[in-house]
């Protein structure tokens, strides 16, 4: 199966290309906007393609059996990119789209959430863009295409700057720890390799023309945020684990966060690399307290995912993180951010 992977230079995209290359039934081609973001380390083929250029994308999709949309970035890249992809796939007669969405499409809802739960764009620009993107994929299906939408929770594992590297640095510097009621929300963590499993199973899932299905992705044994923070802190030797009150957390996020973010942008603009503390986005404070639990039973049943045990995932994260200098500068531009 000849498959184009859009966003192949990102965290999930790179891991997916490696997993696909190890199979005999799929021929993966990575799609990237720039030559610098190509994938020489994977040994796989790649092409240059602008996902916001309808004509170029339609040309690129000719002859492909499926396309996997792992594109991250700003709201336009997510929403408009999905609209362009839907039209390009129709024009190129590419029959199937595997679209990577997010649990953020469910908004601030709490409790057990299934794929039939209502979408709510109320969590900010990211949730709105992802809801819009899903609507564009649905339009592709209405025109006769086949689509599988995957809605992962927080994708982590070795190499995850967002949910491992950054969290580890906060723990080591005492800015994060046991958050009390502020960290009692379910983490909905899912190993990046399990997301890749789901994508490859979705490529082979029997579907008819004009059929759309969606799957939540979260490990059944994913813990509450407090448990994850304490487990990671102990494994890294960031002890004693501090109890962080809501006032301290909010001061860090709302007072220190904006100037830190501005400094990051300034350094990027002038092309300089400088180790700065990671700002804590306000959206994460909401997420850590949100009692949302993804029901991933349909993914287990229909995609046959063999979920990576939490302990195994944790060990691989610690092994990766322990080999890094916590003062290194880090590039978060290529990871999928759920807030």
Locations of regions flagged by a protein language model:
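N-terminal Rossmann NAD(P)H-binding glycine-rich loop of SDR-like oxidoreductase domains
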Residues: 3-23
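Conserved Rossmann-fold cofactor-binding substructure of NAD(P)-dependent oxidoreductases
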Residues: 45-64
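NAD(P)-cofactor binding segment of oxidoreductase domains
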Residues: 67-100
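Short-chain dehydrogenase/reductase
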Residues: 75, 123-134, 154-157, 161, ...
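Catalytic helix-loop patch of NAD(P)-dependent Rossmann-fold dehydrogenases
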Residues: 110-156, 177-178
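Substrate-positioning beta->alpha
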Residues: 161-166, 182-204, 212-213
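Mid/C-terminal beta-alpha module of Rossmann-like enzyme folds, strongest
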Residues: 205-279, 296, 335-339
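Amphipathic terminal alpha-helices
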Residues: 289, 294-304, 308-339
């Amino acid at each position: 199966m000849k498959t184009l992977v859009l966003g192949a230079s990102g965290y999930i995209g790179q891991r997916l290309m490696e997993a696909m290359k190890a199979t005999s039934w799929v021929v993966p081609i990575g799609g990237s906007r720039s030559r610098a973001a190509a994938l020489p380390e994977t040994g796989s083929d790649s092409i240059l393609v602008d996902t916001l250029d309808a004509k170029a994308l339609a040309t690129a999709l000719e002859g492909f059996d499926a396309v996997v949309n792992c594109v991250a970035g700003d709201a336009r890249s997510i929403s408009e990119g999905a609209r362009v992809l839907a039209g390009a796939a129709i024009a190129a007669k590419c029959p199937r789209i595997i679209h990577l969405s997010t649990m953020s499409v469910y908004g601030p809802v709490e409790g057990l959430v299934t794929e039939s739960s209502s979408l709510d764009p109320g969590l900010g620009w990211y949730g709105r863009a992802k809801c819009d993107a899903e609507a564009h994929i649905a339009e592709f299906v209405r025109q006769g295409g086949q689509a599988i939408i995957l809605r992962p929770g927080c994708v982590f594992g070795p190499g995850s700057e967002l949910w491992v590297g950054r969290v580890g640095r906060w723990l080591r510097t005492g800015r994060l720890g046991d958050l009390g009621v502020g960290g009692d929300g379910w983490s909905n963590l899912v190993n990046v390799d399990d997301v890749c499993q789901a994508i490859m199973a979705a490529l082979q899932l029997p579907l008819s023309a004009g059929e759309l299905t969606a799957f939540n992705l979260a490990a059944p044994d994913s813990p509450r945020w407090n448990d994850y923070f304490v487990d990671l802190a102990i494994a890294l030797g960031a002890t004693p684990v501090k109890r962080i009150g809501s006032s301290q957390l909010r001061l860090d996020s709302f007072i220190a966060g904006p100037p830190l973010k501005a400094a990051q942008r300034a350094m990027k603009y002038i092309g300089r690399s400088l180790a700065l503390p990671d700002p804590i986005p306000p959206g994460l404070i909401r997420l850590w307290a949100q009692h949302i639990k993804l029901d991933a039973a349909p993914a287990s049943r229909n995609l046959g995912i063999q979920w990576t045990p939490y302990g195994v995932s944790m060990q691989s994260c610690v092994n990766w993180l322990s080999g890094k200098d916590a003062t290194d500068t880090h590039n978060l531009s290529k990871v999928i951010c759920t807030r």
